[in-house]
Amino acid sequence: MSRIGKRIIEIPSSVQASVEGSKLLFKNNKEKHELETHNRVKITLENNQLSFQPIGEDVQSRAYWGTYGALANNIVIGLSTGFSKTLEVNGVGYKVALGNKTLDLSLGFSHPVKYPIPAGIEMVVEKNTITIKGSDKQKVGQVAAEIRSFRPPEPYKGKGVKYSDEVIIRKAGKTAKK
């Protein structure tokens, strides 16, 4: 039995949820999200509690059961509290600035990197720290991964863009001949 699928999702008072056929609609005072579900999962919404049940006992139905439970839970958490990721930029001459709808990165290339900020994402820059906030967990993680991919941290000096909780395994440099 799916531990994630059988979990009942409590919907806070700041989020309204409704079921229309195989669609789940979530909204708060600012945003709304829609989750299109598969026909192998039964959706139940009663007393601000959302639950899912597989329609069949086959492997595919049970997989959808847990998947849609996790996706719906992420939407509810995103609309009520939101998600955030923090990136740190380390290196001599590496700079970050917030432009008009773009993030301007100076990462040691011959040109500055301009990253357009997608809709639904908010960024805060303090010194060499970038905080990415949003209500969509997948989009926040994707944006953080794309920014990190411009200059991933290297193992010798640790220069580059890294997650704030990421541990870089350092390597020793070359040793001199005797």
Curated annotation (Swiss-Prot):
One of its GO terms (cellular component) is cytosolic large ribosomal subunit. The keyword Magnesium does not apply. GO terms for biological process: cytoplasmic translation. GO terms for molecular function: rRNA binding; structural constituent of ribosome. Keywords: Ribonucleoprotein, Ribosomal protein, RNA-binding, rRNA-binding. Belongs to the universal ribosomal protein uL6 family. This protein binds to the 23S rRNA, and is important in its secondary structure. It is located near the subunit interface in the base of the L7/L12 stalk, and near the tRNA binding site of the peptidyltransferase center. Part of the 50S ribosomal subunit. This is Large ribosomal subunit protein uL6. It comes from Helicobacter acinonychis (strain Sheeba). The gene is rplF.
